[in-house]
Amino acid sequence: MKGLRTPAARAVAAVLTEARNKAGLTQREFAARLRRPHSVIGMIESGQRQVTVPEFITLAKALGADPVELLHAVIRQT
């Protein structure tokens, strides 16, 4: 899982986790909004699974966050 060790991959996981917490959602609640198993959210947040750009946008919107602002947060962390 070489790509998951990159600073950018870690930043994506951290930013999405922070946004979920800010939204006041558990992993299960977030997953329910997306109609996905909660294990998918856990894998993303723990860095076991990368997300594509379209998926990042979907995740951000499901959290009520601006995808561009979240991407800027990722860039600031790298």
Predicted segments, located by residue:
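Short, charged recognition helix plus adjacent turn
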Residues: M1-K2, K61, E69-T78
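A short, Lys/Arg-rich alpha-helix, primarily the initiator
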Residues: M1-K22
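Residues within the helices of the helix-turn-helix
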Residues: T17, R28, I57
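The alpha-helix within a helix-turn-helix
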Residues: R20, A31, A60
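Short alpha-helical DNA-recognition segment
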Residues: G24-S46
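DNA major-groove recognition helix of helix-turn-helix
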Residues: E45, E55, L63
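Short, basic-rich loop-to-helix N-cap that marks the start of a DNA-contacting helix
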Residues: Q48-T58
